[in-house]
Amino acid sequence: MHTFEIYEEYYDWAPLEGDSEARVHLLTYGGEDPPNMYQPQEPLVAKSYIDDVRMTRREYKRLLWMELNKINGVPKPVTLYEEAGAYMFYLALPGRDAAVFLQEQLPEVVVSTLKQIGRYLSFLHKQDISECPFIYSEAPIHTDLVFSHGDFKLSNVIVNENYITGSVDMIGIGVRDRYFDLAAMALDIERVLGREYLEYFYEGYRIKDHLDQEKLDKFMELVEA
């Protein structure tokens, strides 16, 4: 029995909301033998880009690169399965997506969580980019280069009991200007929670007092394009 058959046989598959281009399932181990040390019993995520094996390979390759470079707060890859399509499997981050979580919370929890999201992004942006092979910074607008998430929005941030466990949908990671991620999250916070909550995200990132609004606006246009 190969790995995919083990996952089909011994894990319960529950569909998750995600990118419309991908099928995403949460896998929980149901017991009664296998799996063993090579098929972990922790919850897994199975993800497959619909009709595009290359995109599934691409995201899995990025997860492997982040694991090799010891980047924390991101999914840990388990395996890639290919046969008439492709599925990537990774260890599930505990918690729920922040877009759902925050809409159920009292304002003080929303404020605290947004500050944490800002701190998490600041941590991600501090990762070493000297050996990063994924470059998206050719345009002149990219001047302050960092390790970028590439699709940093509330639904891609995972929250567990009021703390951030990491982020998902890592297919777009790479070298960009820090304002690309700042703009993407700012747009999403405005849409989901309201403009009045932006300051707490900026405070967590420690950019509140020196935010370049003109540059942010330009990147908002780029993100929305």
Feature annotation, model-predicted:
Residues I6-P15:
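Conserved N-terminal boundary motif of the eukaryotic protein kinase catalytic domain
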Residues G18-A22, D33-P34, E42-M88, E104-R119, ...:
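A conserved alpha-helical element in kinase catalytic cores
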Residues V53, L145-S148, N160-L211, E221:
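Active-site Asp-x-Gly
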Residues L216-A225:
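Short, amphipathic C-terminal "tail helix"
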